[in-house]
Every structure is written in structure tokens, then in C-alpha cells.
Amino acid sequence: MTQQITLIKDKILSDNYFTLHNITYDLTRKDGEVIRHKREVYDRGNGATILLYNAKKKTVVLIRQFRVATWVNGNESGQLIETCAGLLDNDEPEVCIRKEAIEETGYEVGEVRKLFELYMSPGGVTELIHFFIAEYSDNQRANAGGGVEDEDIEVLELPFSQALEMIKTGEIRDGKTVLLLNYLQMSHLID
């Protein structure tokens, strides 16, 4: 018997920036027992992220920006080193990530390669992230990057070996970034 889910109630607790739901549902377990659950679910939309790499120079492009949630959770400066990313906002993932790459890093990338889609925090967050990589070159630099409007983004071009070391030292603690850097290492796109 497969599990069945019956929605009992979906109450919106907040929709100031993203939407926080309080969801009550019945879950019919495999043994037939029905269990009522009440959970908060945070809907922030789906997103996309991309790691830019240069195989010849053996470098990657990352960004550093303030992330309030990390600051609240003990990251004293709130600064996080991560891959370029953004919410889809009704765009297709590839369209989104091309826009974000130009806005945040300044690079207008050519061919992008989609790797996978992952739920990063499925216990309470709806977001599905689309993961991409793309090779970049210096002549693809369209502007200085840094984000738009209220963003204050620092663009970092780092040796790939240094970025991997920064995972070990704790300087890089963003999940999507660690995944993409490890993927790049395992795939031997930079040797």
C-alpha cells in the first residue's frame, strides 16, 4: 500500500517576502494507520545556481554576500561565499541562471550544462534548485558584476584548488557551492 496524503488545512502565517504556510494533513501510513500532522512549510519559490570555471586557468568564479539567515544562526559577519544563484521568478532555469550570472558575476556565459535538481531542505522548505556549470573566459566579462539594487556582491575569481581548500577550512559553508565544487572535482573538468 502506498502512502496517501489528505490536506486538512493550509493557513498562511506570513507572506511578507516569501510565504510561510501552516499545513495540517493526514498521512495514511503503509500499514493503513492514519496520522495527523501539522507542519510549517516555507515557500520561497524555486531557484537555480551555476558554477563558472575556467579549465585553462584552473579557476572558478564565486561571490561573497551578506546572508541574514546565516548571521542569525551564528555567522558573525553574515558574509557567505557561494555560487551565483537566484530565484526563477517565472523564468526557465537556464534563462534565470544566465541573467544571474551577468548581474552577479559580470560574465555572459556561453554554453551552460544542467547537472541536476535538488531539494536542499525538504523538511520544511519547498525550494527546488536547478544546478548548472559553465566554462567562462576573460573575454566573456560584460561588466563588473556585483548584483542589482540592494545587493552588495563581491566577485571572487579563485584558483580551484584554493576553493576546495576553503571547504576544508570552513570558509565555504554554502551547501550548493560545496556540491558544485565537489562535482567539478569528481568530473575532472579541471585537472
From Swiss-Prot:
Entries under InterPro entries matching the protein: NDP_pyrophosphatase, NUDIX_hydrolase-like_dom_sf, NUDIX_hydrolase_dom
Cofactor(s) recorded in Swiss-Prot or TrEMBL: Mg(2+)
Keyword terms: Hydrolase, Magnesium, Metal-binding
Swiss-Prot/TrEMBL catalytic activity: GDP-alpha-D-mannose + H2O = alpha-D-mannose 1-phosphate + GMP + 2 H(+)
An example molecular function term from Gene Ontology annotations: hydrolase activity, acting on acid anhydrides, in phosphorus-containing anhydrides
GO biological process, one term: nucleoside phosphate metabolic process
Annotated binding of GDP-alpha-D-mannose, by residue: Y17, K38, R39, E40, R67, A85, G86, L87, E104, E127, D150, E151, K176
RNA-binding keyword on record: no
Enzyme's top EC category: hydrolase
Motif Nudix box per record, residues: 86-106
Binding site for Mg(2+) 2: E100, E104, E151
SUPFAM superfamilies the UniProt entry points to: Nudix
Record-level GO cellular component terms: cytosol
PANTHER family (UniProt xref): NUDIX HYDROLASE DOMAIN-CONTAINING PROTEIN, UDP/ADP-SUGAR PYROPHOSPHATASE
Family label: Belongs to the Nudix hydrolase family. NudK subfamily.
NCBIfam families on file: nudix-type nucleoside diphosphatase, YffH/AdpP family, PRK15009.1
Function text: Nucleoside diphosphate sugar hydrolase that hydrolyzes GDP-mannose as its preferred substrate, yielding GMP and mannose-1-phosphate.
Protein name in UniProt: GDP-mannose pyrophosphatase
Organism, scientific name: Shigella dysenteriae serotype 1 (strain Sd197)
Designated gene of the protein: nudK
